[in-house]
């Protein structure tokens, strides 16, 4: 009796479909992921149970560093930095927002200090690419002229007295604005101007009032709801320093803002919303 021969099957497998799925998944994650932005210093936020997530667009972040443990700097209590993130569309992207705020801050600095920065187009372009900055206005041109790695190293030196945006206890929003308050006023002016321009443009196209309000994302986030203002302070920073930041925000009529925290069981930053009285 003859043996039954088992037909050999090919071990080759067509992986075309699997490769297509892999490429699609990789593309999806690349497009939807939010990359962590570089910050001048590591800030360990305090813990809380809040699960409100920080927005990724139309956001102004105020970072307050920890105390200088070496006590070698006159400002050992913590230094202030600012970053701006615009909308996801090309009309009011982070690049456009940063340049607009810088130009407005330049005008306000001249108005309140009687000095001109005389920034160049190249310096505007450099500022538009910066995620976070923290120097007095007088040192801003020199900072923008630095090569990026040298700039990061310069701002990362928490013992340098030239690092950190100057802030004080000024309560008068009409005059004698400190550097921090000038930036706050600048971003408000930009949000107001952009709101007016957008309202006029949409009204001409026949948009309804509801549609217009839905498009006021920058103004709504920064001024109306305060969702777009986040204070990120180190858990070891003195309360007086953080409170001074809060006072300055309220002096400039930014009474709604968020304090970034970390969940006790997670490391992802969350926020606790605070509203000034």
Please provide the spans of the model-predicted regions:
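Generic cytosolic/nucleocytoplasmic N-terminal low-complexity/intrinsically disordered segments
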Residues: 2-8, 204, 273
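Hydrophobic single transmembrane helices highlighted by the model
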Residues: 3-40
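Long, low-hydrophobicity, acidic/polar, solvent-exposed interaction domains
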Residues: 36-277
